[in-house]
Amino acid sequence: MKTPKMNVESFNLDHTKVKAPYVRVADRKKGVNGDVIVKYDVRFKQPNQDHMDMPSLHSLEHLVAEIIRNHANYVVDWSPMGCQTGFYLTVLNHDNYTEVLEVLEKTMQDVLKATEVPASNEKQCGWAANHTLEGAKNLARAFLDKRAEWSEVGV
């Protein structure tokens, strides 16, 4: 039986046919004034086989959200997937996949040098007790170790 087409792009992705880690264009929208929004699926873990623990994911979210903007002024958002296997990177008016990979690489290298998780306090975070710098670094290191595979989605 054929699965009906869904409104959410990732629900139409056959998660059994991908090979994490990878970075793929998940969506591209053009606004009425010509602006282009590109959403990337930045997958760290193999769907339905592994996932990121919440404190590590949460800390990597904070670190990347802060650090990536040092490398790219076109970043709109870096947000975690509910399935805990990756993140979505949303950019504005920048449609160069190779440059996005380079920015992600530089950002992950900077994560490895971090001495603290930014905004991991009760004033700036909704779950401040749920962080681990070492866990975030482990995720970044494992992702970087497979840098040569990021463009190989497997679909």
From Swiss-Prot:
The keyword Lyase applies. The keyword Lipoprotein does not apply. Pfam families: LuxS. Keywords: Autoinducer synthesis, Iron, Lyase, Metal-binding, Quorum sensing. It is an enzyme of class 4 (lyase). Fe cation binds at H58, H62, C125. This is S-ribosylhomocysteine lyase. It comes from Helicobacter pylori (strain P12). The gene is luxS.
